[in-house]
Amino acid sequence: MFDVIAFDADDTLWHNERSYRDGRERFRRLLARAGVELDDAELEARVTRTEVANIEFFGYGVSSFALSLIETAIEATGGRVAARDLHAVIDLARDMLAEKIELFEGVPDTLAALSSAYPLMLVTKGDLLHQRSKLERSGLEPHFSYVEVVSHKTPRVYEGILARHGIDASRFLMVGNSLRSDVLPVVEAGGWAVHVPAALSWAHEDAEVPDHARQRCFELPSIGALPGLIDALSAPAMARPRAAPPAVDSPRRPSCVRPVRL
């Protein structure tokens, strides 16, 4: 059923968002030393607003995050932020760039199993040097036949990747934690997607899945369940996994189909 299986990296293969949360906490303490007291919600709102506004100019990643923190510090202090505090933000960014890569449980075994049967692709957004460095340090690079580091994940970007590698969209599967980046644009481009929600995620990556997209995406509790799902999808139609109906008392429908039998 699939010719290529692609994976997101950050918060799909390895932990990432908690590094940014730790960075925001360090930044909150920095602002407090500068005389600006913000609670967690206000800090999150300010930093996220600045980050999202800057995506168009600086893209995603630690460098963009650090620039957004510096801009937030200037605004929050009315331009009175000290040079030493700006330097502390730079140190924070350097620490984030050098952090040890911690894989999610089941990732090495899942990639080893799938790479023996399918060409695997990594499609990750962010800073090229940092993403390449993380992939090398993760020990996962040998599993991937293709690596794509992009600035944004849109239907057009995915269409370009598929065209460049001669991949039929209907035989392409993308696996990731972000509905906005890994699921919806792939489905719109004609592919299939698996949503593996992460315990921690950036609010900007949340999105609603329209009804027409639900039957081309699946939701799994962990990446370790992926080989079983792919085996079931590749089996004859009678053996394919059934979708779990939405719970009657659930305030929110599942974003994608949740297989109940693999």
Per-range role (PLM):
Residues 1-2, 84, 108, 112, ...:
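Asp-based, Mg2+/Mn2+-dependent phosphohydrolase catalytic module
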Residues 124:
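Conserved phosphate-coupling serine/threonine residues in phosphotransfer and NTP-handling enzymes
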Residues 23-31, 47-51, 89-94, 131, ...:
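Hydrophobic alpha-helical core bundles mediating ligand binding, dimerization, or RNAP-core interactions
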Residues 37, 46-95:
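A metal-dependent, Asp-based hydrolase signature
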Residues 1-7, 12-45:
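Active-site neighborhood of HAD-like aspartate-dependent phosphohydrolases
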Residues 33-38, 78-80, 139-142, 166:
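Short helix-capping segments at alpha-helix termini
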Residues 117-118, 190:
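Glycine-centered short loops/turns at secondary-structure junctions
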